[in-house]
């Protein structure tokens, strides 16, 4: 690949925003490169983990509707000695993917643990993974703003932070920045007819899954859940055992029959209009549901970067994608700025490692980027091909990304650095069957410690079968 600029990168100080899964892997790979004078990680919570750092108290700051990414960050849900920020996790949550492919390349989950770990298991795992980079983390420190300053051909980034324990403001300059703030902060609640008026008349009826914690809160209530992605189905399944029967599940596309049976809900079409007087909704087929006690939106989140709003051109418009990036990672005009963790429907931990391996090598000048024109052309082609689902990867798209980035990283001109993971045939097979395996895990009481216990056994390919056939 050609160089992005005639001058090499001059990166000595690196900032990492966020000590969640992507921020931790970034710190590890940057250290392993042995090319940077300092790596500093800013984390607003008092512990690592990002979304996995659970807050029992939910956020009550959701806007209804919420369709704009240009909204200030949530305040902490608990003030005092250690402010805590609301997590999108809920009390009883298990991963959607088995730990055997979810894990980082150099650390297994406990082999005697559940094959689909609980949220507490994952948080404990991340704390363990963080041990050799914790000294880099400035906890309870929130990034308030980040400004680009150019010195010749080199970019510099001025970052202003606030210590949330004593209110002290600080400003530091960095040569490169890893933006690993995650994308589960700003909720998405669509602007449906009369939703504002409904919310004003019936405050608290409309909520988002980010504020969901326990199903007992819905005991005896008439409930409508909106959305049938993984979290929507899981939450609906929990609530349906406590609320008035049947729980209503509003969807755009039908739920697979086996999954719907497990949820125990009645599937209905999309909401067309809110009915204020009836405390109800009119659905797209004309059906009316009245006297709703809870309408829970499981409709995802918007990409948002409140500390980077001065960067031009802007990174986001409607919050559905991030603009100006090469390979969903490098800012094309300012490649000392990277955004790991944007791909959706991928296994995030190993993907974040693959991304970190590449940008650590690029910034140390042992790996090059294509010319700006080529990177821009890639983004244009990708946008035309994927449309609105720009960051949404197809089935096994993460396996392809791991292969691509592993090959890219291992073409480095230096032997320094940490090698990113790739999946073998067994792991690719596990990636292919995880949806069916998770459903079986739920149906059998969330007790299984292996895929074999659930009836899934890998069969090695015969000589005439291709890897694709096996997957």
Language model: regions and residue ranges:
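Glycine-rich FAD pyrophosphate-binding loop
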Residues: 31-58, 248-255
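Glycine-rich dinucleotide-binding loop and its adjacent helix/turn
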Residues: 110, 118-125, 133-135, 155, ...
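Rossmann-like dinucleotide/flavin-binding elements
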Residues: 210-248, 307, 328-364
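Glycine-rich active-site loop/strand segments that organize a redox cofactor
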Residues: 44-128, 326-329, 369, 374-392
């Amino acid at each position: 690949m050609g160089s992005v600029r005639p001058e090499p990168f001059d990166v000595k100080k690196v900032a990492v925003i966020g000590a969640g899964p992507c921020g931790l892997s970034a710190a590890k790979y940057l250290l392993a490169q042995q090319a940077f004078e300092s790596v500093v990680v800013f984390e607003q919570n008092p512990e690592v983990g990002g979304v996995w750092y659970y807050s029992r108290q939910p956020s009550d700051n959701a806007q209804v509707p919420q369709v704009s990414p240009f909204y200030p960050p949530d305040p902490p849900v608990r003030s005092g000695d250690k402010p805590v920020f609301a997590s999108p996790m809920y009390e009883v949550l298990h991963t959607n993917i088995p730990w055997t492919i979810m894990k980082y390349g150099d650390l297994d989950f406990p082999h005697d643990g559940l094959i689909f770990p609980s949220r507490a298991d994952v948080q404990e795992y991340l704390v363990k993974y963080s041990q050799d980079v914790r000294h880099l983390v400035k906890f309870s420190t929130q990034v308030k703003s980040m400004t680009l300053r150019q010195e010749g051909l080199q970019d510099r980034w001025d970052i202003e932070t606030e210590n949330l324990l004593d209110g002290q403001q600080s400003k530091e300059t960095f040569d490169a920045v890893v933006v690993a703030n995650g994308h589960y902060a700003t909720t998405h609640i669509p602007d449906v007819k009369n939703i504002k008026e409904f919310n004003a008349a019936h405050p608290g009826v409309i909520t988002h899954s980010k504020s969901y914690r326990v199903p007992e809160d819905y005991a005896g209530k008439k409930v409508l859940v909106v959305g049938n992605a993984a979290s929507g189905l899981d939450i609906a399944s929990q609530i349906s055992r406590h609320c008035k029967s049947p729980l209503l599940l509003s969807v755009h596309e039908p739920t697979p029959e086996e999954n719907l049976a497990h949820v125990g809900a009645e599937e209905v079409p999309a909401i067309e209009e809110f009915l204020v007087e009836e405390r109800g909704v009119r659905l797209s087929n004309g059906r009316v549901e009245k006297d709703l006690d809870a309408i829970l939106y499981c409709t995802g989140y918007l990409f948002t970067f409140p500390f980077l709003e001065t960067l031009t051109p802007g990174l986001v418009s409607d919050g559905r994608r991030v603009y100006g990036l090469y390979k969903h990672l490098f800012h094309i005009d300012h490649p000392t700025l990277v955004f790991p963790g944007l791909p959706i429907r991928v296994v995030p931990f190993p993907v974040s490692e693959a991304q970190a391996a590449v940008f650590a090598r690029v910034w140390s000048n042992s790996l090059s980027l294509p010319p700006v024109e080529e990177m821009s052309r890639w983004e244009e082609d990708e946008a035309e091909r994927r449309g609105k689902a720009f960051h949404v990867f197809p089935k096994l798209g993460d396996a392809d990304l791991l292969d691509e980035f592993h090959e890219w990283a291992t073409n480095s001109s230096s032997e320094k650095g940490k090698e990113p993971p790739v999946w073998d045939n067994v792991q690719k097979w596990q990636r292919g069957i995880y949806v069916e395996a998770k459903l079986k895990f739920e149906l059998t009481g969330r007790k299984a410690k292996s895929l074999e216990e659930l009836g899934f056994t890998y069969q090695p390919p015969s000589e005439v079968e291709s890897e694709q056939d096996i997957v």
